[in-house]
Amino acid sequence: MIKKFPAHRTSAIFMGRALGVAALCIALGGCGAMVAQNPSSSLKPVNAVADAQDSRVMLKGADVVAYFTQGKYVQGTPQIKSDYEGVTFRFSSAAHKALFDKEPKKYLPEFGGYCANGVAYGIPWGGDADTFSMINGKLYIFGGQASKDGFEVDTVKNLALAEKYWKEEVAGSNSMIQRSKRMVFRVPHYKNGEEIAKEVAAAKTKKS
């Protein structure tokens, strides 16, 4: 006979296991993604990966300055880079590196480079360098066009939610633990992919 637990207890058990795995990874110094995304600095957590000799590369090496100077995604090169707060930033030109070195905070992607729509749900996850938006002179990354479209159904509301959860929960947290928590204990306004798609379709119909 299969023993069934109440929903709240099942969630607690799942969360406990997720946190246990995260703690084990920390203790062993393993889990490459966790290590890359959680520098011991004020930038923690960040959407970064290990690549070649660099253990923590922001946005898989995208040139963060190019979004501001060229208005588009441009891949940086490993030969032109800067380290800031324990994170490596790559650039497509020496000129862009110089701009970053002079004023790094100006060019940092918001929410650690994670998908802004995910952060609105308290989930630091995803973020594709080629899907972005510039809002009030700041860089926001999204985990694909569907996420960007969902966010832009109500940019003001969703930006406020993202800023709230980033400030109250995500900033300074361990990305894997925070992600696991909010994948189980979802925020009141949580929407799945299908619900977001319907919301986007309705918004487009209303505009047409």
Spans of features found by a protein language model:
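Bacterial N-terminal signal peptides
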Residues: 18-30
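Absolute N-terminal positional cue centered near the fourth residue
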Residues: 4-5, 18, 37
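Beta-strand cores of secreted/periplasmic/IMS beta-sandwich domains, seen most often
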Residues: 81-99
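N-terminal secretory signal peptides that target proteins for export/translocation
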Residues: 1-14
